[in-house]
Amino acid sequence: MNKHGKVIDVMISDRQALIQFEREGDARRAVDREKGQSFRGNRIDVRFASTSDGSFESRSEIPRNRSPRPLPYERDSRDMSPYRDSGRDRSPADRERYYKALRRGDSSKIIEEPENLNNRHGSPDSYRKYDRSRGIVEEPRSRSQLHQDYPVIPKEIQEPKWNSPPFTDKIGTERPGFDAAIIVMSSELLSYAETIESRLQRQIALTTHIIVLKEESHANACVEDLNNKGVLYAFLVNSLNEQHFSCTLRILYGTPQEHRNMPLNNALTFVARNFERYQKHVRDLKTIAPKPTFDPSRMPPGFIAPDDKIIYYLHLLADSRMLTIEELNEVIDFVQKRMQALASAEETMEKAPITGLPNESVQNSMAPKLSIPGNQPVREEKVIQHQTQLHSKILNILKPVPHQSASGVVDNEINNMEQFNTYNDSNISTSKSNNMVINPKVQQALDTLMQSQFRPTAPELSAPAEENSRNFQPVNNPMANPYSMNPTPNMRPINPHSTQQRPMAQGPGGQPFGNSFHGYYQPPIGQPIFRGRPPFQPRPQYPGY
């Protein structure tokens, strides 16, 4: 607007701006030339400000809307009076002219001054704010009567149809009404901050916001608060930056960056390119993350579909792009939720009964195998129960059935029992030779247990002979076992744990049998040597046969 004439004051609100020229002709020329022009892709409407009756008034301003909740380090916005030099602080010369005008009584030259320059509202704050942003303008708390003569703005100007919403840094999250914040360390640097602001608005079309700090130590807290509010850029300016025409640039969105003492021209070029990439990033959020084409009702139970944000992050990871820690945490949380849902669904399917399978083995093979810690105790209990059942079945098989009592049949049964005992002892001795590391006490207990399990008792000798004949085959049958002989009643067993010398049993031709029937019975004098074996033992190979 400076090309149409000298501008005295500019008032900017959310949806309109009021520009006051020094001369009325300049204002009419600006209206004729700027009406219907395009600004940032939108058509603008330029007209004269008027009162409620439609008449033109040279000094026209709009009421200021109250901004959102002020920052914790801000003080009230400095009101922009048309008689003040762009809202800058009073110099001692201005303050002296103010008091001289009061003494002379010339009210036309009185410069508006706040009630208390040092403490405007009674409680000093650590920060002071110089607000000329687009969209965040605060109304003075104690001087609202200064704006009573403002005209009524037409509804067409208050709510133009061409107004566009602000950019969004994240999906569904709106940022404040400015893109860049210019933070100055003292009020003497406001002129340099205004220079940066004008170049940002003219060259890059960024909405800006000027903040004045009272102490430099509050700069980090101010930048952190701006980052939480979603501001894109922050320019930090001190006295040295003004001398060297430089600034400290901080990029707050995405991966934070800081460029200290960067020349202003280079900083503006860098911000222009970065802001263009940011706009492309916002547009890509809608194009790269399409809506899912699958039907959730056809998905398996426990399936969690990713939203647009997660799909976009996954595309970036697939393209080897860099993500921030917050974005990676969102992806990790989604993956963990999906894993938990799938694990719970598989656990439910495992507990449900499975029907229509051919047998138990196929059912066990088709059952899902989960590595969930909660199923481990259940499996251990099943294994222990299965082992207990097998142990009981083995004991039932090996446990002798009570039998009967005819002398010949009893002798055959005793012969079979003793032969089976001899065979088990031989197997125990063989296992002992294979595994040398066996506790002697454990071995003695096993021998005693085997002796007690297979030794016939007195009631067993009184069982009927018919039952014994049905369950046992006589071993003295030459066709069944031609090498066996019935033991005589005067055969006495030898204690296997005694130190008595045991003679080696002899086979046909005087050859020893070996370790299979080593000395469990000592025949009396004149009796033949015992040469029997259990029916299920394989036939030993003797030399000479």
UniProtKB/Swiss-Prot annotation:
Effect of gene knockout: RNAi-mediated knockdown results in severe impairment of regenerative capacity. The cycling stem cell population is significantly reduced at 8 days post-injection. Isolated stem cells are unable to repopulate an irradiated (and thus stem cell-depleted) host.
GO molecular function annotation: RNA binding
Tissue distribution: Expressed in somatic stem cells. Also detected in testes where it appears to be expressed mainly in spermatocytes and round spermatids.
UniProt-annotated location(s): Nucleus
Compositional bias (Basic and acidic residues): 26-46, 72-112, 122-131
Identification of the protein by name: Nuclear receptor coactivator 5
Sorted UniProt keywords: Developmental protein, Nucleus, RNA-binding, Transcription, Transcription regulation
Gene designation: NCOA5
Domain RRM positions: 1-51
InterPro entries per UniProt: Anticodon-bd_dom_sf, Nuc_rcpt_coact/corep, Nucleotide-bd_a/b_plait_sf, RBD_domain_sf, RRM_dom
Keyword Repeat appears in the UniProt entry: no
GO cellular component, one term: nucleus
Keyword Isomerase among record annotations: no
Biological function: Probable nuclear receptor coregulator that can have both coactivator and corepressor functions. Important for maintenance of the adult pluripotent stem cell population.
Compositionally biased region (Pro residues): 535-545
Region annotation (Disordered) ranges: 26-131, 498-545
GO terms for biological process, alphabetical: regeneration; stem cell population maintenance
Main location: nucleus
